[in-house]
Amino acid sequence: VGSQLAAQLSRENHDVTVVEADKVRMTQLQDELDIMVIEGNGASPRVLAEAGIDQCDLMMALTNSDEINLVASISACKHNVPFKIARVSNMDYYLLDDWLSTKSLGVDLLVNPEFECALQIRNLLSVPGATDVAEFGGGRALLLGLEVQEGAPCVGESLMEMGIRLEHHDFLVGSISRSGRTLIPTGPTRLEAGDHIYIICLREHLDEAYKFCGLVRQPITRAMILGGSKVSVYLCKMLERMKIRTTLVEHDESSAEALAAELDNTLLIHGEATDVELWEMEGLDETGAFLALTRDDEENLLSGLIAKNHNVPVVIALLEKLNYVPLVNKVGVNTAVSSRLAIVDTILKWVRRGNILSLATLKGNEAEIIEFIATNKCKLLNTPLKD
């Protein structure tokens, strides 16, 4: 998470300093990014002083250790750092009466990667088949990523021609991913089968957007999840509220028993994550969504491939190694999610706050979608969008 944010903020001309305990990782960051990197423990007052905590405007504690992040945040408070963000995953901290509130700890934003990742998956399941989903306009408008199918109504025609033919269409193509390139479409742009397009539409016009790409939206009623990770637990509770029948497969017997006690309306199965016969016995062929959420990226990719070969409509894999993300489409998995990346948009939106209401970074796409308030100083006021 830290390296991703450091790269983005550095590109925006912020002076960025990263504290990194791993010497190999420190060297990589120095070679790849135009930032200052300090070797050491983020909870150490000496290291934080060396990193210039007295002069910083924003401190983000985003290590894998909640305790280091909390200690670093307390240090930032003592040094009167104006804004502080901490990554805290352990729900026990949130259950202590206001212990993590801004008043008691002084942290401005707390982020939970696993919860944000589960939320991202829930949103994807509410728009089946989409690879990306983001809400704008208080949830009234959606950005969704869809793949253009062979024979889709949009193939071959320019966007200008389609605009004339579909006089009252209520969606907008904002970006296209084609053969690894990102395109911002104009009137003459023609869509091709296999294009990955990002459409902005009102929630009530989702079916039109699907039809445009040659797809039919089928609501998810059953889901199968592999692995009893934190992401899985958060997601199961969300799916229970959505009335989606969910089966969770966990290989560790004691973990499966503990999860069965915690989850009310989720069917817990003790078994190996790659036991295809077990999946079939538990209704894989009738499942609308298969979610590979174990702690092993390779296992998630492999099981996702198997599920896709069983014609499961929606397959999502949890991948924490970001260099695996390009493999997703090649093995037939619909989309990948990452608990590390799930909080990036949340943090960036907060960092840029002010007039920015929402922000979405598109996977495998160099574009970024931003919802902002047009103030009196905005140069685009009273200017036709076509200009």
Model-based region annotation:
Residues 1-387:
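Cytosolic regulatory regions of ion transport systems
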